Amino acid sequence: MNSHHFLVGLTGGIGSGKSAAADRLAELGAAVIDTDLIAHALTAPGGAAIEPIRAAFGDAVITVDGALDRKAMRDLAFSDPQARRQLEAIIHPAIRAESDRQIREARGPYAVLVVPLLIESNAYRDRYDRICVVDCPVDVQIARVMTRSHLPEDQVRAIIAVQSSREEKLAAADDVIDNSGDLASLYAQVDRLHARYLAAARATG
């Protein structure tokens, strides 16, 4: 738990709709910090993780403009568990440090840290006052990701397979947003949670 902010950990599998939930919370005034955006900045040209990644994996995973070649790195990480662990050992501490900095500087009644692999990373668990999982059936996840990313079904299933199961996420959740319906249904649930988080933040603040 962070001493300065009431902190919500927001997570969900790929295609669950956690970005839509996070965007709504930001609209309502929460300070939203997205670890995916932090990871992109770290692996953009000149990003702090580029040289350690180059040292570990060579130029094959760096684009000509000096960014991480996401496809090459994803293919390597999926085919080689050791490579995935090596990449995580570079990226995760850097994400943790930058997210901590952004939480400290956050403006808003409470902070939301969006972490795709929150449940998988037990080291994070003691940070949060509440863990919120955005949930939907796996077949809905697959259809959304195939539509959005134009990936074949087997590749989407492979991504889902390395994430924690739906059951594991739900077991770890303090709060669950059911995103199997439309955006209006998602927003209604997010709005209710926002009111609860506001009240809890005021009570602890």
Curated annotation (Swiss-Prot):
GO terms for molecular function: ATP binding; dephospho-CoA kinase activity. Pathway: Cofactor biosynthesis; coenzyme A biosynthesis; CoA from (R)-pantothenate: step 5/5. Its EC number is 2.7.1.24. CDD domains: DPCK. GO terms for biological process: coenzyme A biosynthetic process. It is an enzyme of class 2 (transferase). It comes from the Bacteria. It catalyses: 3'-dephospho-CoA + ATP = ADP + CoA + H(+). Its main location: cytoplasm. It is found in: Cytoplasm. Keywords: ATP-binding, Coenzyme A biosynthesis, Cytoplasm, Kinase, Nucleotide-binding, Transferase. Pfam families: CoaE (PF01121). GO terms for cellular component: cytoplasm. Residues 7-204 form the DPCK domain. ATP binds at residues 15-20. PANTHER family: BIFUNCTIONAL COENZYME A SYNTHASE-RELATED (PTHR10695:SF46), DEPHOSPHO-COA KINASE-RELATED (PTHR10695). Catalyzes the phosphorylation of the 3'-hydroxyl group of dephosphocoenzyme A to form coenzyme A. Belongs to the CoaE family. This is Dephospho-CoA kinase. It comes from Aromatoleum aromaticum (strain DSM 19018 / LMG 30748 / EbN1). The gene is coaE.
